[in-house]
Regions:
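Conserved phosphate-binding elements of NTP-dependent enzyme cores
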Residues: 1-185
Length: 185
């Protein structure tokens, strides 16, 4: 089985194309649903990011430099930013820490939640692609390099059924190769 995909051959990821609701909208107007002015907590985080990197939340998403878009989507790395929070008593509290990023935030919330409703809401932003480790073959690298009469397992499994049947029917392996292959054929 592929190591990254647990043998499924596919990989789910949060697709930034699905996250950006309208490239003409600004972050303040809701370019990223749930991170606009209506969500005080997330919007205050974006305000801190914008202040630190020197851009305006009212700028349309498409007009933000890619560097700023990447900081919003993927975070500040190890760079600490100043965040101001309101605690339970209504006091302002200042904290310095890296910004997680919208996509890592969603990945964490999707992975850690026990709420089916939260998982369903976040799954709207997921896309599926072939696993980057096994390239969709569902096999570890070592298994992908095993040859059977000059064809590897992914090549054989991609054949139409009739062609694969003919391939196996006409397959002749002699000696030691035949002994080894007999166990799996």
């Amino acid at each position: 089985a592929g190591q990254t995909c647990d043998g499924l051959g596919t990989h789910q990821f949060f697709n930034e194309g699905k996250l950006i609701t309208n490239e003409d909208s600004s972050l303040a107007e809701g370019a990223i649903r749930g991170w606009d002015r209506g969500s005080v907590y997330y919007f205050s985080m974006l305000s801190s990011v914008a202040k630190h990197y020197g851009f305006k939340l009212e700028t349309p998403w498409k007009d933000l430099p890619k560097e700023h878009q990447d900081k919003v989507l993927y975070g500040s790395g190890k760079t600490k930013l100043e965040f101001i929070y309101i605690n339970d008593r209504g006091d302002k509290v200042t904290r310095n820490h890296p910004f997680e990023g919208v996509i890592p935030n969603m990945e964490r919330r999707y992975r850690d939640t026990e709420s089916q409703m939260v998982r369903e809401e976040l799954s709207k932003y997921l896309s599926v692609q072939p696993c980057p480790s096994c390239h969709g073959t569902r096999l570890r690298e070592e298994a992908r390099h095993v040859l059977l009469a000059e064809k590897n397992l992914p090549d054989i499994t991609c054949m139409p059924i009739g062609e694969a049947f003919d391939y196996y029917t006409n397959l002749q392996l002699e000696g030691r190769k035949g002994e080894i292959a007999a166990k799996i054929l």
